[in-house]
């Protein structure tokens, strides 16, 4: 078979070379259009149909590459964006693929632009003209910020694959479920005054103390009520991330802020969390009206679990010779899972993601290509 696209390493180099940082800081945020166009060209050379869509009100794009007709098939998905990097911590060029000590260094090597190089290489090694079910490749935007790429895709697409593989770095473990993430900020507004007469003011730190006591009760309740046996940390976690208040030792504190996060297990919805927090703090809200303000900090991600009624997971396990596991981090699975049962499976370690000198250990290369080929041959032929 004549190869129509560059070698695996050359593709990898071309993907890492293009900066695609997603950030809530507009000065750092970058469009992914150049990378989307490059991927489109690669998949076009393999006779895939290309559909590029702009995410409304952004300079970001999704790409869906499709080959074959009919129902079902496989959707391989990855995000095109990376996090920002600290140039003082990196010892290598983040945008140049560097091979050293059996490792491939570069921003996005594991998280997760490199996954597209594996898909393209695998497709070059099999005769896809003989497939009986379609193959889809999805490249999304903004996974590292608000996951707007995945959220927009499920609103604008009508495909229904048999299952979806998200190629996030799982060390080639088959992840069937992961926790969600929701973060909050609470402001308590008091009245300042001289500390020599506390009765002349309202100390926001003292009210926040009551809030924290209630949240700690909620923490225990979540741990006891929503235990999930499949997770290494089998309960929803709550973390108090920061607390700030006061500006002088002799002044009654007028403003106190607390930031905290909850990572729910599957079975605990984001709506339930919101209701539980409101119920737990209701008495304090009533006692101190218009002084306690609760808000979400960032876009929330629900927990995800592969649907128990979908028996196809057993076939996937046997095909890959892998046993399913769980993860404590988040992916696009809760959103893509709305169009098809979703698993997370990809090369590299999550420990390298978001770190300086991010790298892919080359020991993952051969087994990853083998697994992708097996999935296509076992489920699309």
Curated annotation (Swiss-Prot):
Q: Any binding details for the cofactor?
A: Binds 2 Zn(2+) or Co(2+) ions per subunit.
What reaction does this enzyme carry out catalytically? N(2)-acetyl-L-ornithine + H2O = L-ornithine + acetate
**Looking at the record's lineage, which domain of life comes first?**
Bacteria
Q: Which GO terms describe its biological process?
A: L-arginine biosynthetic process
Q: Which residues form the active site?
A: 81, 143
Major place of residence: cytoplasm
Cellular component GO terms, alphabetically?
cytoplasm
| Residues bound to Zn(2+) 1 | 79, 111, 168
**Cited SUPFAM superfamilies:** Bacterial exopeptidase dimerisation domain, Zn-dependent exopeptidases
Binding, Zn(2+) 2: 111, 144, 354
Where does the chain cross the membrane?
none
A Pfam family: M20_dimer
Q: In which pathway does it act?
A: Amino-acid biosynthesis; L-arginine biosynthesis; L-ornithine from N(2)-acetyl-L-ornithine (linear): step 1/1
Protein localization: Cytoplasm
Q: Which cofactor does it need?
A: Zn(2+); Co(2+); glutathione
Q: Which NCBIfam families match?
A: AcOrn-deacetyl, PRK05111.1
Q: HAMAP family from the entry?
A: ArgE
Similarity remark = Belongs to the peptidase M20A family. ArgE subfamily.
Outline what the protein does: Catalyzes the hydrolysis of the amide bond of N(2)-acetylated L-amino acids. Cleaves the acetyl group from N-acetyl-L-ornithine to form L-ornithine, an intermediate in L-arginine biosynthesis pathway, and a branchpoint in the synthesis of polyamines.
Subunit structure of this chain's protein:
Homodimer.
- Identify this protein by name: Acetylornithine deacetylase
Task: Name the species this protein comes from.
Answer: Buchnera aphidicola subsp. Schizaphis graminum (strain Sg)
